[in-house]
Amino acid sequence: MSKIVGSDRVKRGMAEMQKGGVIMDVVNAEQAKIAEEAGAVAVMALERVPSDIRAAGGVARMANPKIVEEVMNAVSIPVMAKARIGHITEARVLESMGVDYIDESEVLTPADEEYHLRKDQFTVPFVCGCRNLGEAARRIGEGAAMLRTKGEPGTGNIVEAVRHMRRVNSEVSRLTVMNDDEIMTFAKDLGAPYEVLKQIKDNGRLPVVNFAAGGVATPQDAALMMELGADGVFVGSGIFKSEDPEKFAKAIVQATTHYQDYELIGKLASELGTAMKGLDINQISLEERMQERGW
């Protein structure tokens, strides 16, 4: 008997429900509860936040299932978990545990340098990172129900997330004025499925939500990404590496919701302690940049 998989419509609909919200990285039940109380729409369960993964080096793998279960039992909001790029078994284990989403994530060490997961063969919806329309279309073609910018995780530096969001949006704008022949050439140049690009052209936007991720450290960062067209925000190290995680979590949720209320954002920022220490992207070699993982 063949395995039943979720339809694109159902998976994308589930992701749409998170639109306008904040998804926070957590490493235990206590942090998950802080995130839920602050108004997060979902949490990402993992063993270490990206800044700690970066500092530790070595091979970063899927979180211990005990951590994921602990988080799932602690909150009522959706729980996501990360699997390595191309690691079929990690993803199947997470699916069997009943997580709400799987992030095929470049934050972890890739298991396969040639192939991403065939996400359309799973029941659980997937979120994936992208830096440009080519990566976005390839992941959608594989069955991703949700996208996010890659940014540069664990840096507290928003510059790469801004670059990736602007690039995807500008390439979508270019695509919308192309005829079918031009789309065919564009698909070849990008190495992306023609059918996905045609759908984007016809709708004038991506068929899935695209969140901001990678470097969000302050309420202002979150609001900026919403201003640039993000459908929501992932916050990794920015909250629990800050001086006051509870205040930062609440402030980032508020700033994401009211991203054009600059007086409120200023007030929120003035009441916070010190944000996480940021890293200059230029001090990170290409080989060490997580955003370079995947294709």
Curated annotation (Swiss-Prot):
InterPro entries: Aldolase_TIM, PdxS/SNZ, PdxS/SNZ_N, RibuloseP-bd_barrel. Belongs to the PdxS/SNZ family. GO terms for biological process: amino acid metabolic process; pyridoxal phosphate biosynthetic process; pyridoxine biosynthetic process. CDD domains: pdxS. This is Pyridoxal 5'-phosphate synthase subunit PdxS. D-glyceraldehyde 3-phosphate binds at R166. Pfam families: SOR_SNZ. The gene is pdxS.
